[in-house]
Amino acid sequence: MIIKSAKFMSSATKPGNYPPPELPEIAFAGRSNVGKSSLINSLLKRKKLVKTSSTPGRTQLLNFFEVNESLVFVDLPGYGYAKVSKEMRKKWGQMIETFITTRKTLHGVVLILDLRRIPGGQERENLAWFDLNNIPVILVATKADKFSRQRQLAQQKEMAKALGIPLDVIHVFSAKTGQGRDELWESILDLCEIDDFEQGDDDNV
């Protein structure tokens, strides 16, 4: 996948601060410390565009990134971090729900899971909520490099069983090795109804 340009646009907490709704958008959601920032950086072939942190719950805003002047990635705050107050978790939840249910240019959500962890009730509730609101979802299991290919498949099967979904619905991904990057891009572009990005050399910075 050719990345000609990728840049930070703005951060927001409410609709009045969102960028103009001019390009198709894909949001990225997942538990705190699931590897969301690393996944986005890997997709964009940028090491530090999206700030990574060893402290879960660091992302507290909706962060918008323009890619190839063709689409926008939206980094959502992570969920499930116990040390964040209930009031803050509620605030984040309302902020995310408002964005997902009202943003007309949102084409779908990449829901990020950790391949090392079998999903539970929170993930099933999330999928049910997205389905109820007619939000297309791309499921991605990160940190695949922690397992052999055989073990990856075994974990993928367990995750699919826990979520009650077909095995091939889950993308297996590694930000470290690039495994699954092209396949995930294909799903994203398909969801955004973009044939392909402009061909050329990656403009890495």
Swiss-Prot record:
Give the EngB-type G domain ranges: 22-194
Q: Name one GO molecular function term.
A: metal ion binding
Name of one Pfam family that matches? MMR_HSR1
Residues engaged in binding Mg(2+):
37, 59
The question of whether Chaperone is a record keyword is answered with: no
For the keyword Endoplasmic reticulum, the answer is no
Q: Name one GO cellular component term.
A: cytosol
Q: Which cofactor does it need?
A: Mg(2+)
Q: Name one GO biological process term.
A: division septum assembly
| Function of the protein | Necessary for normal cell division and for the maintenance of normal septation.
Regarding protein family, the annotation reads: Belongs to the TRAFAC class TrmE-Era-EngA-EngB-Septin-like GTPase superfamily. EngB GTPase family.
The name this protein goes by in its record:
Probable GTP-binding protein EngB
Species: Desulfatibacillum aliphaticivorans
The gene for this chain is engB
